[in-house]
């Protein structure tokens, strides 16, 4: 499920040609279409995605400079750079910010707040991937460098949160970091000790997209009803993505059970969108959910 976000967002005109190369209904084609929706729907949304990509590239260049182009840095950041979910959370934020908007079109100032929130989600996601890929087999230098890089990205996310000047969003997104750490510890514990498997999955895979979507709605001053719908869409989408990536069981009964659960998650995500107006952003979110179960 590799997804050429970074190169694509610097050249929005390439969307059509890339789509022609992708299998219709595939994960990559669905996400490419979603980017296209944002590009058509508003020049500002398209610009925000492009700016975010350039800023992440610039951040990587900064870290390279500080570490004297340490060759270990490439190894440390490789899991993030190769991640199929790179820039996925910012895309969710921008789609949900469009789907949940109430009343007049957003101002330029509000678009900038969308960008800050999108950047926060990507910084947290990048830091988490770098941290969870730290292994005992790595050298002390690798471990120290990976820890520092991940911590630096979390620090940058904290600064962006402060600039949003929204206490509710600061608390929610800070709790995402705590959720990811708690989920990581839970996954390392055995059997009945520690967290249940369901709770661990929620912490590791579902709360990040759920709370990112919720915060996009909060920026729009949406009603609690809309806020709940945004949260539920992100939660069930996260759960379905985690289950879809689970290794296929050789047991037919287990496989059927997992498929049934996956379909339920996808249907729950889609039903959450029923409260939104029928616009392209909503349709893009619907297609993203549908693509998970294919």
UniProtKB/Swiss-Prot annotation:
Molecular function terms from GO: all-trans-decaprenyl-diphosphate synthase activity; prenyltransferase activity
Record gene name: dlp1
Record keyword Mitochondrion present: yes
Entries under CDD domains matching the protein: Trans_IPPS
Organism phylogeny: Eukaryota, Fungi, Dikarya, Ascomycota, Taphrinomycotina
Record field: catalytic activity: 7 isopentenyl diphosphate + (2E,6E)-farnesyl diphosphate = all-trans-decaprenyl diphosphate + 7 diphosphate
InterPro entries for this protein: Isoprenoid_synthase_dom_sf
Organism the protein comes from: Schizosaccharomyces pombe (strain 972 / ATCC 24843) (Fission yeast)
Protein name: Decaprenyl-diphosphate synthase subunit 2
Function text: Supplies decaprenyl diphosphate, the precursor for the side chain of the isoprenoid quinones ubiquinone-10.
């Amino acid at each position: 499920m590799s997804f050429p976000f970074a190169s694509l967002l610097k050249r929005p005109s390439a969307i059509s040609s890339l789509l022609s190369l992708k299998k219709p209904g595939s994960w990559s084609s669905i996400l490419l279409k979603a980017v296209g929706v944002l590009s058509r729907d508003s020049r500002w949304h398209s610009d925000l995605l492009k700016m975010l990509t350039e800023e992440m590239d610039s951040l990587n260049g900064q870290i390279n400079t500080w570490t004297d182009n340490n060759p270990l840095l490439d190894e440390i950041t490789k899991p993030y750079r190769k991640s199929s979910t790179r820039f996925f959370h910012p895309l969710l934020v921008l789609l949900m910010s469009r789907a949940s908007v109430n009343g007049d079109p957003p101002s330029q100032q509000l678009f900038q707040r969308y960008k800050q929130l999108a950047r926060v989600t990507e910084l947290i996601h990048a830091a988490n991937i770098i941290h969870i890929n730290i292994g005992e087999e790595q050298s002390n230098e690798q471990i120290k460098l990976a820890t520092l890089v991940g911590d630096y990205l979390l620090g940058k996310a904290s600064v962006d949160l402060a600039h949003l000047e929204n206490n509710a969003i600061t608390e929610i997104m800070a709790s995402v970091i705590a959720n990811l750490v708690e989920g990581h510890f839970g996954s390392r514990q055995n059997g009945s000790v520690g967290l249940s498997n369901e709770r661990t999955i929620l912490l590791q895979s579902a709360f990040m997209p759920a709370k990112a979507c919720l915060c996009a709605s909060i920026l729009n001053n949406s009603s609690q009803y809309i806020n709940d719908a945004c949260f539920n869409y992100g939660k069930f989408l996260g759960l379905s993505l985690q289950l879809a990536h689970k290794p296929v069981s050789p047991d037919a009964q287990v496989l059927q059970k997992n498929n049934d659960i996956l379909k339920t998650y996808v249907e729950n995500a889609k039903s959450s969108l029923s409260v939104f107006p029928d616009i392209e952003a909503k349709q893009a979110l619907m297609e993203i959910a549908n693509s998970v179960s294919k």
